[in-house]
Structures are given as structure tokens and as C-alpha cells.
Amino acid sequence: MLGVSKSEAVQFVKNAGLSRVAPGVYCSEEAWPDRLYLIQLRNRKIVFSHETALYLHGLSDRESKQPIVTVKRGYNASHLKKDNIEVHTVVEDWFEIGTTTAETSFGNIVRVYDKERCICDILREKKRMDIQVFQTAMNAYFKSRDKDIHKLMEY
């Protein structure tokens, strides 16, 4: 398609010292792969949520032990669970509410729920959460200058 044969591409990867980190994605051996970005590349129908989104928005100083994503109800997420990704499901009507993008610590852009949606999600599941993460996120949100209380109430 681009005028490069498969054998030429394979030879380039070998000569450049690249390693395959995902289908169609290669990294130099010195580079650290961006796990969240790789998950997003392989799974276009996910949105990072809960503690993962809180961390990406700067509402938590703790990165979650495992990435947390939300998918539409009915989506077969068994491959995500095998990759040690925590999966939440929502009805289709709620899936797109509050979707936005955020930058990973490696500078890549991934889909996440906005701060207000994250607050709603953690309020619904606060008994499941670490209390310190919950309190830190709530305090950080309500102290932030870019909070949108009207949007929060709408959600």
C-alpha cells in the first residue's frame, strides 16, 4: 500500500533494533512503552475511567494498580481482563457522556471521562474504592479552578 514490502519492513525493524509491543506498534529497546496508549490503540471502544482517569486528570497522585476502563454493555471484554485490565460496563446511552481526552505521562493522547463524570463514577462506587484515593480526588476536584459544578449536577 505504501510501496514497502513486508520483507523490507521486517528487515527495517530488525536493523533498527525495534521490538514489537503490539500489533503494528514497535519501540526501540531504550524506550519505555506507554501501556495506556497501547491499550487504547488495540481497543478503540474503551474509555479510561475511575482511578485511571482520576490520575490522568491530576485528581489523584496514585496510579491505579491496573488500568481501569469502561465499555458498553454487551462488549466482549474477556481479552481486556486477561491483560489484567479492570473493566466496568455501562448502558449504551451513558457510554459517551463525558468523554474527552487526556495526556498520558508519556505524552500520548487517550480517551478518558471528564472530571465530572469521574466524580459521579467514584461516588457510585465509593465503597469499593480506597478511601484515601476517594478523599484526595474529591478534595482536588472541589479545589480546582476548572471544575464545572453545573455539568456535575447535570450528570
Task: Give the residues covered by each predicted segment.
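Polyanion-binding surface elements
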Residues: 1-2
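Glycine-centered, phosphate/nucleic-acid-interacting loop/turn motifs that mediate DNA/RNA or nucleotide
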Residues: 16
